[in-house]
Amino acid sequence: MKRSGIFIAIGLFCLVSSCGDRDRQVEEALSLSGNNRNELEAVLKHYEGDGRKLEAAHFLIGNMPGSYGANPIVEQDCSAFYEAYDSLGQKYGYRVGTEWGKQVDSLWKDFSNRHRVRQELNYDITRMKAEDLIREIDLAFRVWVENVHSRNCSFEDFCEYILPYRRQNGLSIDNARREFNKRHQGKYFVKEGKDWQQEIDSLLYEYKYLTHSGFWGTKIPIWNAATLEKMRHGLCAQRCWYNSLLLSSLGIPVAIDFVPAWGNRNNSHTWNVVLINGESHAFEAFWDNDRWKYKRIYNNRDDDELWGRFRLPKVYRYTYSNHIEGPLADVEVDKADIPELFRSVKKVDVSSEYFETADVTVELTGEAPQGVKYAYLAVFGYQDWHPVQWAKIENGRAVFREMGKDMVYLPVYYKRGGLLPAAEPFRLRNDGTMEKLSGNEETEEVAVRMVTGAPAYDQNREYLGCMKGSRIVGLLDGKSEEELCRWTDSLALEPVVRK
């Protein structure tokens, strides 16, 4: 089945299955499996008479449409590159730095220009083998019982956070979880009286050598845990699925949360979350001396003395189960008219687990393009606006649910990849009221006080010395006119907190 065809089929499947029971959902999934149907039916037959495992198999197969990964052939295509990359890493002692990074980017650019890298997608529903799925189900049930911290979690949490073999779309299916379990079985999470958080820290400390790449080599394909271990460096999103594979292989209910765009900074971010005793506990994916800080610094209220101010418009959680809603559930909406964030069925909104939210009603004063039925709230970053929530247009207004406070939003329409203003931008205050930001012809002086967002980053400390000996001069007609300032020593960097 072609890629476009299977996406259409998955959309129709989700619409049908959301109204039926699990048996109907499974049957609809099997109808999409093509020549792979016998493999999936073999799993169901294998667990006949074992109620819980059969129900787990139903969950995995019923939600399998929409799950996909890289064709493992990409590893073969890139094997020579990975060897060259490792040699370069040895040269620099596997340390991330500017010279190393430039050579990594150059190495990948040269390799990808000279070699074919087949980054094709495999859909789980047409590729998953019975033997592999049975092994994953049996492993999940075994580690669930063995783990003293999670053995009493609900079956629903087990299915969503321990059971799934796929922790995020795009990864190739392999034996990573079985390998992780073989490495650590019996060492962690099996003795009563131990603190589960400290045990997780101890386990992740064993993988402290896996560090952030500093955004070098971002286009290099890393589609499985073994490749990330070989490369030693990656992005937050990659370390998150790695941790999710690792922890779930030992029975820890774990997921991946993300902010699609910051409300007061550039970029986005991804991190891990553990779900124990009905509560979620977020933590930094890479090794950090204060890794469990996110519920504290992502509360949309405080300014952290060390990390500065974070404002989050939304937090979503990747799921294995399918959740179709909004424009994606509307058969009258062309998929091309839906922002990429809302084309995925594998996520849920968990904003309220992190901060107080507010429902926002917006009067849409901008004319909507023909056929547009939904509006979006967007935040600004990297010189552009990024949609973070949707709402259906009704009588010229839209109600956006559970929005983060203390940041600026722009209501927009989305049509064929383009954004159009739907109303004036506004600031959502801490008390949930809206302050419209209307432009006019008046001008006035503005004094700007710059407060660094993350004052203690190691790189910032490193660069402070570079200012020594620098001077600032005023220019007149392109010629130096007057020296305004000279630094005779290194700068100091002091955290400033707004009260």
Question: Which stretches of residues belong to each language-model region?
Answer:
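Bacterial Sec-dependent N-terminal signal peptides
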Residues: M1-Q25
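N-terminal accessory/pre-domain segments preceding catalytic cores
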Residues: C19-I200, S249, N299-K499
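Hydrophobic/aromatic-rich core segments of domains that either
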Residues: L30, H46, F189-E199, E206, ...
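A generic structural motif
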Residues: F215-T218, A391-I393
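Sec/Tat-exported extracytoplasmic proteins
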Residues: N36, Y207-T211
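A structural motif
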Residues: I173, L210-W216
